[in-house]
Amino acid sequence: MSSSSSVSTAPTIGASALNVPMLVSQLMATEQYPITALQNVTTSYQAKLTAFGQVQSAVSTFQSALQSLTSASSLQANTATASDPTVLSATALTSAAPGSYSLTVGNLAQSQSLVASGQTSLTNAIGTGATTTLSFDFGTITGTATGGIYGTGTTFTSAGGGIKTVTINSSNNSLQGIRDAINAANIGVSASIINDGSSTPYRLVLTSANTGAANSMKISVSGDATISSLLSYDPTSTTGQNLNQTIAALNANLAVNGLAVSKASNTISDIIPGVTVNLSKPSATPVTLTVAPDTATVTKNVNSFVTAYNALSTTLAKMTAYNPSTQTAAILQGNLAILNIKSDLNGILNTQAQGAGSLNSLAQIGINSQPDGTLAVNSGLLATALQNNFKDVAGLFAATGSASDSLVAYNTYTSSTQPGTYPVNITQLATLGSLTGSAAPGLTITAGVNDTINMAVNGTSATLTIPPATYSSAQALASEIQSLLNGSSAISAAGISVSAGINASGNLSISTNNYGSAYSVGLNGGNGASGLFGSAPVAAAGTDVQGTINGANATGVGQMLTSSSGNSQGLSILVSGGITGARGTVSYSNGYAYTMNNYLTSLLSSSGALTSSTNELNTNISDVAKQIASIQQGLIAKQAMYTAEYTALNNMMTTMTSTSAFLTQQLSKL
């Protein structure tokens, strides 16, 4: 009987080592899923942040376009056009009335020029160097000049602007030094030196800085006799004219619609209310000056407003769109902040303006909303509105005001002022501070006898010394006192001035040039006080305007009256005259552009909806980044754990493989 036997082969354990890096990498890839999800969230936030940036840019662009419509002056601007711009040009304020004017320019205004006798040197000393005072007075010369010298009977009437002085001494008593001292003093005289080519070639030329007949010079010199003989100039004295007049001071002479007009300057702002005319040359041919509303600029600004609004509206629509066919939503679709902005803008545009005159909606000037949320301009309706209601169009856009009384003017408003029309009642008009004499002034002033007066303006004191003379009239004496008082260093340094004249009773009267209780004129003595003002002069401080606006108390400062409570709070008006009692109404409108601009400013502010939304997104992005960092930190530990575990397993399997090989070898020997 035969028998057979077989030997079993042991299974191979861990025939090869594990690929630990690959295993760990695959495991870690799975662990990355939460990070990938958070990175997708970050991408979404960043996309929204970019979208909000585009919205902010569109809002800023729209606000920039609004600026030209928030200013009433730009919306109510006028143009002034001359038929011959080589003869004259002009500018018109918003207050100018449209119209056409015929102007003929006879001669231009010019400054007086005086020329001194020639000197042989620019730098040689003139005179002894003793301290010398040049005193300049400006006024009107009445008389005839022959060869630059005025004859007998010539008069000089001071303009009352004050005596201006220049000091010459041993440091500057050359011709060049005198020139530089006069220019440095800034007294309204320009000094220059001309070389005429003669044996005494250097001649000092003095030119009044201002044009006009009333800016002729009278120069007195005290001190060095040589300088006095060179520069003293009294046009009323045939022996006192040491300078020669080469150009006489002249007013500009023109005719406006046939009416003769004489003005001191070639820039004239008081012949046509609200219009400044600049004369360039004489012309016997009439020039037509046309003042008209600047409708072209307003039309351009309105179209810019609509274009910028449409760009913003399109941006908002794009960011919040939903495509039903593809079932995809824009990045900010459903965002509450953007939805609120769209709603707020529509609300502003669809609210009627208050206090805007005859117009209260954009539709009345041809601006209408379209189905897609944009605006469209009907150019025909806009042109008609500008033609028929130019001033009221401004009230539709800007913060504007107007008064029904011609002597009451809208001034300004505050953020507290509500749109509306408010009644005005005046209980007291503003007055000037004044000092009025009780008797006619004596016209003869004698040095050391009656030539000084001590005065105070708004509490600032000045002692005046009146030049001794027998004055031609009480008005001439008043002009001299006005000139001295305004020329006082203390008074001019305080930035105040006065006007002096003769009242209906023939008495001297001095008044401040500003209205209100802060202004006064006082007389504090002097040897000439009683002779000029009498024994009982009357000093009266100015008063402030008083009254109500919309029935509420208002605060008056000078001629300015400001409402202090109610809907009109902060509304300020200028009452320039008239009577006490009811003075009509004042209207205020804040307009669409003004309201829109305030809204956009708040929207873009640090606490506004757009800033808050972007801040929230940035915070969310930061929070997600922290979450990712935390997870990544955990994954580092987990990766180390996986590596350790599988490395240990791999080592164990390697050991088992070695044992298996040994056993296999031993079994094969049986």
What are the functions of these language-model segments?
Residues 1-43, 56, 64-202, 207-311, ...:
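Bacterial flagellar/type III secretion structural subunits and associated motility module proteins
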Residues 318-339:
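Surface-exposed loop-to-helix/strand elements on domain peripheries
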Residues 48-49, 62, 66:
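N-terminal alpha-helical signal peptides/signal-anchor transmembrane segments
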Residues 320, 324, 636-668:
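Structured, hydrophobic secondary-structure cores that serve as assembly/anchoring elements
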Residues 51-58:
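Long, contiguous alpha-helical "rod/stalk" segments
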Residues 50, 303, 333, 615, ...:
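Alpha-helical transmembrane segments of integral membrane proteins
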Residues 43-51:
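N-terminal, post-signal-peptide region of Sec/Tat-exported proteins
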